[in-house]
Protein backbone atom coordinates (compact mmCIF):
# COMPACT_ATOMS: atom_id res chain seq x y z
CA UNK A 1 0.00 0.00 0.00
CA UNK A 2 1.39 3.41 -0.92
CA UNK A 3 1.97 6.15 1.62
CA UNK A 4 -0.68 8.24 -0.15
CA UNK A 5 -3.25 5.48 0.32
CA UNK A 6 -2.32 5.11 3.98
CA UNK A 7 -2.81 8.85 4.47
CA UNK A 8 -6.19 8.69 2.75
CA UNK A 9 -7.36 5.85 5.00
CA UNK A 10 -6.22 7.70 8.12
CA UNK A 11 -8.10 10.80 6.97
CA UNK A 12 -11.26 8.77 6.32
CA UNK A 13 -11.01 7.12 9.74
CA UNK A 14 -10.77 10.55 11.37
CA UNK A 15 -14.17 11.73 10.07
CA UNK A 16 -16.38 12.73 12.95
CA UNK A 17 -20.07 12.12 13.30
CA UNK A 18 -22.75 14.14 15.02
CA UNK A 19 -26.51 14.25 14.64
CA UNK A 20 -28.23 17.25 13.11
CA UNK A 21 -31.84 17.55 14.28
CA UNK A 22 -34.80 19.86 13.91
CA UNK A 23 -36.49 21.79 16.73
CA UNK A 24 -38.93 19.10 17.92
CA UNK A 25 -36.27 16.41 18.23
CA UNK A 26 -33.89 18.87 19.93
CA UNK A 27 -36.63 19.58 22.50
CA UNK A 28 -37.04 15.84 23.10
CA UNK A 29 -33.29 15.43 23.57
CA UNK A 30 -33.27 18.31 26.08
CA UNK A 31 -35.89 16.51 28.18
CA UNK A 32 -33.11 14.18 29.34
CA UNK A 33 -31.58 16.11 32.23
CA UNK A 34 -28.21 14.40 31.76
CA UNK A 35 -27.78 16.10 28.37
CA UNK A 36 -25.52 19.16 28.41
CA UNK A 37 -27.27 21.93 26.46
CA UNK A 38 -24.56 24.21 25.09
CA UNK A 39 -24.94 27.67 23.52
CA UNK A 40 -21.92 28.36 21.27
CA UNK A 41 -22.90 31.93 20.32
CA UNK A 42 -21.18 35.11 21.50
CA UNK A 43 -21.66 36.40 25.03
CA UNK A 44 -23.83 39.28 23.75
CA UNK A 45 -26.07 36.89 21.81
CA UNK A 46 -26.40 34.60 24.84
CA UNK A 47 -27.20 37.53 27.15
CA UNK A 48 -29.90 38.79 24.76
CA UNK A 49 -31.73 35.46 25.05
CA UNK A 50 -31.06 31.74 24.98
CA UNK A 51 -32.93 28.46 24.88
CA UNK A 52 -34.56 27.74 28.25
CA UNK A 53 -32.62 24.98 29.95
CA UNK A 54 -29.25 25.90 28.48
CA UNK A 55 -26.64 24.64 30.95
CA UNK A 56 -23.46 26.10 29.47
CA UNK A 57 -22.27 28.90 27.22
CA UNK A 58 -18.91 28.75 25.41
CA UNK A 59 -18.30 30.98 22.38
CA UNK A 60 -17.08 28.76 19.53
CA UNK A 61 -15.29 31.74 17.95
CA UNK A 62 -12.95 32.11 20.94
CA UNK A 63 -9.53 30.48 20.55
CA UNK A 64 -9.94 28.60 23.85
CA UNK A 65 -13.27 26.97 22.90
CA UNK A 66 -11.84 23.44 22.84
CA UNK A 67 -10.01 23.70 26.15
CA UNK A 68 -13.02 25.31 27.88
CA UNK A 69 -15.35 22.63 26.53
CA UNK A 70 -13.10 19.80 27.70
CA UNK A 71 -12.71 21.45 31.12
CA UNK A 72 -16.46 21.98 31.59
CA UNK A 73 -18.09 18.95 29.95
CA UNK A 74 -17.57 15.47 31.35
CA UNK A 75 -16.01 13.05 28.86
CA UNK A 76 -18.61 10.83 27.20
CA UNK A 77 -21.45 13.29 27.82
CA UNK A 78 -24.23 13.87 25.35
CA UNK A 79 -23.99 17.50 24.22
CA UNK A 80 -26.92 19.24 22.50
CA UNK A 81 -25.64 22.47 21.03
CA UNK A 82 -26.84 25.43 19.04
CA UNK A 83 -25.80 28.79 17.62
CA UNK A 84 -27.88 31.53 16.00
CA UNK A 85 -28.75 29.83 12.71
CA UNK A 86 -26.90 26.52 12.55
CA UNK A 87 -23.56 27.47 10.98
CA UNK A 88 -21.17 28.00 13.90
CA UNK A 89 -22.69 25.08 15.76
CA UNK A 90 -21.58 22.67 13.02
CA UNK A 91 -17.99 23.76 13.64
CA UNK A 92 -18.41 23.26 17.39
CA UNK A 93 -20.17 19.92 16.87
CA UNK A 94 -17.35 18.57 14.70
CA UNK A 95 -14.76 19.66 17.24
CA UNK A 96 -16.56 18.08 20.20
CA UNK A 97 -17.40 14.87 18.32
CA UNK A 98 -13.71 14.58 17.44
CA UNK A 99 -12.98 14.67 21.18
CA UNK A 100 -15.33 11.77 21.90
CA UNK A 101 -18.53 13.54 22.89
CA UNK A 102 -21.92 12.41 21.59
CA UNK A 103 -23.12 15.56 19.84
CA UNK A 104 -26.56 16.64 18.69
CA UNK A 105 -26.76 19.91 16.77
CA UNK A 106 -29.86 22.06 16.26
CA UNK A 107 -30.08 22.54 12.48
CA UNK A 108 -31.93 25.87 12.56
CA UNK A 109 -30.25 27.26 15.66
CA UNK A 110 -31.72 29.71 18.15
CA UNK A 111 -33.63 31.51 15.38
CA UNK A 112 -35.48 28.32 14.43
CA UNK A 113 -36.21 27.59 18.08
CA UNK A 114 -37.76 31.04 18.57
CA UNK A 115 -39.76 30.80 15.32
CA UNK A 116 -41.18 27.48 16.55
CA UNK A 117 -42.43 29.22 19.71
CA UNK A 118 -40.22 27.22 22.06
CA UNK A 119 -39.27 28.65 25.49
CA UNK A 120 -36.38 31.07 25.85
CA UNK A 121 -34.81 32.86 28.80
Question: What is each model feature region?
Answer:
Residues 2-29, 43-78, 87-121:
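Rhodanese-like catalytic fold shared by cysteine-dependent sulfurtransferases
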Residues 34-35, 76:
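Short, high-confidence coil segments that cap the C-terminus of an alpha-helix
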